[in-house]
Curated annotation (Swiss-Prot):
Its main location: cytoplasm. The gene is fusA. One of its GO terms (molecular function) is translation elongation factor activity. This is Elongation factor G. The keyword Kinase does not apply. NCBIfam families: EF-G, PRK12740.1-3, PRK12740.1-5, small_GTP. Pfam families: EF-G_D2 (PF22042), EFG_C (PF00679), EFG_III (PF14492), EFG_IV (PF03764), GTP_EFTU (PF00009). SUPFAM superfamilies: EF-G C-terminal domain-like, P-loop containing nucleoside triphosphate hydrolases, Ribosomal protein S5 domain 2-like, Translation proteins. Keywords: Cytoplasm, Elongation factor, GTP-binding, Nucleotide-binding, Protein biosynthesis. Transmembrane segments: none annotated. It is found in: Cytoplasm. GO terms for cellular component: cytoplasm. One of its GO terms (biological process) is ribosome disassembly. It comes from the Bacteria.
């Protein structure tokens, strides 16, 4: 069994990210083929891609979970280890992208040569900026009709606000695309017809018809490099031509320094090709090794002291440092059970040893350690800093938690996961399905932090929440396939509330029942008033004096009032925000009892509530929409049409952010409407804010529906 201790300078932890259908998975497949991990090229459209290993992924032709894989690539005869994470591009799966970026050192952004910079490209670019991930770009699909490399480069400037350094030019276009011009070596890489799998290419002189264009773009490359690197600026000003080595070094320095922070522009080298037609992938691999960071290039990771959150602890990427790692993904393997993917930041990790989960303060034992290749695996005995591996045996660790040496505890910065934006009710079809549903929900929520579950006490339904309709569709599909749960999926119900708007100073109620033998008697006098502000949903005040009601019966009046509040008088929704004051009453030596006073309290409350101007309340959601400026008017108009109240507008990294309060009942279907109104370029998040009174005309409809009218 292997024990790995890698030369960290020769390791690259990268992600491949893009909009859905830009060709990420195909690009990854080609990388695996050329690096010798895969002996057959997997195609996404025939459902055979190695990285897309879930059944739903193969059916839908999209990547849902980030499969991690390790491969090797020699540059100048020196072997390099590349850990690749293939990320999904669909907006519903941004959590997968988010957690991948958290543990990567660099990224390859793939663009569709026909469509250019698409909406989800903007989203993942912003996510990469947030985590300060240096990246290189690959303009893919240049063999397609309508592909335009230079338009795509312009869109990188216009839509992403980045500075592209064009490294290659395409030779030929669409069906005649045959290779690329390399602007560093000023040579052409041409793929011959006979090498259908693109495993070899010829390095030749630049074709005559491209020499002028190549010279012009080479000048632009030198200019861009000089503007962003002091050493190159000196050479440039002296009129000296840099060597290839000097250029490579300068471009590496620029790429590593480009973190996409708020006060700086992301500078990114741009390459081109067609992964599907096997052209341009090897030079892209060279670029991954040449320009993207090794774990040594990334600053020491910072965490904080377990006992003192203000105290910062730094861990360098070295085997000699105490062990620290971040669990960034949980996956259920059909044969092995629960696998936890871990990025090792410092120290060594050995199979069979105990580590500390510093977030929970619990010890965990590492079972086996695996190096993953999509869904195949290789067992290793130990692993060092800078690596990404999967471990078995962790019982309590969930996504985003830190594992570390128990003698040197640290908590690394975790990941933020957005709250679910869409919810549906799910009902198992049988008792057996109910039990299986419990297991399925536990497993799926371990794997996916953006999948949340709660039981609605009012409707008795199990409500599942996620990042979008496709997200929930896939989760329900997995419940059926992997856990054999048969369930009906319905529409969620809004949990309305009821309250009162006016005080009622006195309600007298006498409960009297005589049926032979011991009767029932209880007399109460109460007052009701709304509780203004604050979070109190109910208060009970006892003002009875002189023993008019025996002390032991007073809690029964309180219990009766609370019972009545469970089902409001307008539409049967729970009542909130009421203060009940018990003023006076009377009792009978024989016939009074706790039950009698409970009934009296309940009936008096109902009578009073009818006179206290009852109203219906609805949950209001704090909604934040991030949109390109062109769609701002449409977004605001749409929110207003949903009874929304716009509260603020601001600018954020080139986009506009609209904040407002919108009733939850008006937000169903918003995901699809927003996408169609903004061509998919806007994103939104929402969370519960408060309850507010429902307008009378809307309330009348809700009440009629609740009463079955």
């Amino acid at each position: 069994m292997a024990t790995t201790s890698l030369d960290l300078a020769k390791v690259r932890n990268i992600g491949i990210m893009a909009h859905i259908d830009a060709g990420k998975t195909t690009t990854t497949e080609r990388i695996l083929f050329y690096t010798g991990v895969s002996y057959k090229i997997g195609e996404v459209h025939d459902g055979a891609a190695t990285m897309d290993w879930m059944e739903q992924e193969q059916e839908r032709g999209i990547t849902i979970t980030s499969a991690a894989t390790t491969c090797h690539w020699p540059l100048n005869d020196v072997d390099h280890t590349i850990n690749i994470i293939d990320t999904p591009g669909h907006v519903d799966f941004t959590v997968e992208v988010e957690r991948s970026l958290r543990v990567l050192d660099g990224a390859v952004t793939v663009f569709d040569g026909v469509a250019g910079v698409e909406p989800q490209s903007e989203t993942v670019w912003r996510q990469a900026d947030r985590y300060g991930v240096p990246r290189i770009c690959f303009v893919n699909k240049l063999d397609r009709t309508g592909a335009d490399f230079f338009r795509c480069v312009d869109m990188i400037v216009d839509r992403l606000g980045a500075t592209p350094i064009v490294m290659q030019l395409p030779i030929g276009a669409e069906a005649d695309f045959t290779g690329v011009v390399d602007l560093v070596s000023m040579k052409a890489f041409v793929y011959p017809e006979e090498a259908a799998k693109g495993e070899m290419y010829n390095v030749v002189d630049i074709p005559e018809n491209l020499q002028e264009s190549a010279a012009e773009w080479r000048g632009k490359l030198l200019e861009a490099v000089a503007e962003n690197d002091d050493a190159m600026m000196e050479l440039y000003l002296e009129g000296n031509e840099p060597t290839q080595e000097q250029l490579h070094d300068a471009i590496r320095r620029i790429t590593l320094a480009s973190k996409g922070s708020a006060d700086s522009v992301t500078v990114t080298p741009v390459f081109c090709g067609t992964a599907f037609k096997n052209k341009g992938v090897q030079p892209l691999l060279d670029a991954v090794v040449r320009y993207l960071p090794s774990p040594l290039d990334v600053e020491a990771i910072e965490g904080h002291d377990v006992k003192d959150p203000e105290k910062v602890i730094a861990r360098k990427p070295s085997d000699d440092e105490p062990f620290s790692g971040l669990a960034f993904k949980i996956a259920s393997d059909p044969h092995l059970g629960k696998l936890t993917f871990v990025r090792i930041y410092s120290g060594r990790l050995e199979a069979g040893t105990a580590v500390l989960n510093s977030v929970k303060g619990k010890k965990e034992r590492i079972g086996k350690i695996y190096r993953m290749h999509a869904n195949k695996r290789e067992e290793i005995a130990s692993v060092g800093a800078g690596d990404i591996i999967a471990v078995m045996g962790l019982k309590q660790t969930t996504t985003g938690e830190t594992l570390c040496d128990d003698k040197n505890p640290v908590i690394l910065e975790s990941m933020d996961f957005p709250a679910p934006v869409i919810q549906v009710a799910i009902e198992p079809k049988s008792k057996g399905d109910q039990e299986k549903l419990g297991v399925a929900i536990q497993r799926l929520s371990e794997e996916d932090p953006s999948f949340q579950v709660h039981s609605d006490e009012e409707t008795g339904q199990t409500i599942i929440g996620g990042m979008g309709e496709l997200h929930l569709e896939v989760l329900v599909d997995r419940m059926k396939r992997e856990f054999r749960v048969e369930a009906n999926v319905g529409k969620p119900q809004v949990a309305y509330r009821e309250t009162i708007r006016k005080a009622v100073e006195r309600i007298d109620y006498t409960h009297k029942k005589q049926t032979g033998g011991t009767g029932q008697f209880a007399k109460v006098q109460i007052a009701l008033e709304p509780i203004e502000g604050g979070d109190a949903s109910y208060e009970f005040v006892n003002k009875v004096t002189g023993g008019r009601i025996p002390r032991e019966y007073i809690p029964s009046v309180d219990a009766g009032a609370q019972e009545a509040m469970q089902f409001g008088i307008l539409a049967g929704y729970e009542m909130v925000g009421v203060r009940v004051t018990l003023l006076d009453g009377g009792y009978h030596e024989v016939d009074s009892s706790e039950l009698a006073f409970k009934i009296a309290g309940s009936q008096a409350f109902k009578e009073g509530a009818r006179k206290a101007s009852p109203v219906l309340l609805e949950p209001m959601m704090a909604v934040e929409v991030t949109t390109p400026e062109d769609y701002m008017g449409d977004v605001i108009g749409d929110l207003n049409s949903r009874r929304g109240q716009i509260q603020a507008m601001e600018e954020r990294s080139g986009a506009r952010v609209v904040k407002g309060l919108v009733p939850l009942s008006e937000m169903f279907g918003y995901v699809g409407d927003l996408r169609s109104k903004t061509s998919g370029r806007a994103s939104y998040s929402m969370q519960f804010d408060s309850y507010a009174e429902v307008p009378r005309n809307v309330a009348e409809e809700i009440i009629a529906k609740a009463k079955g009218e």
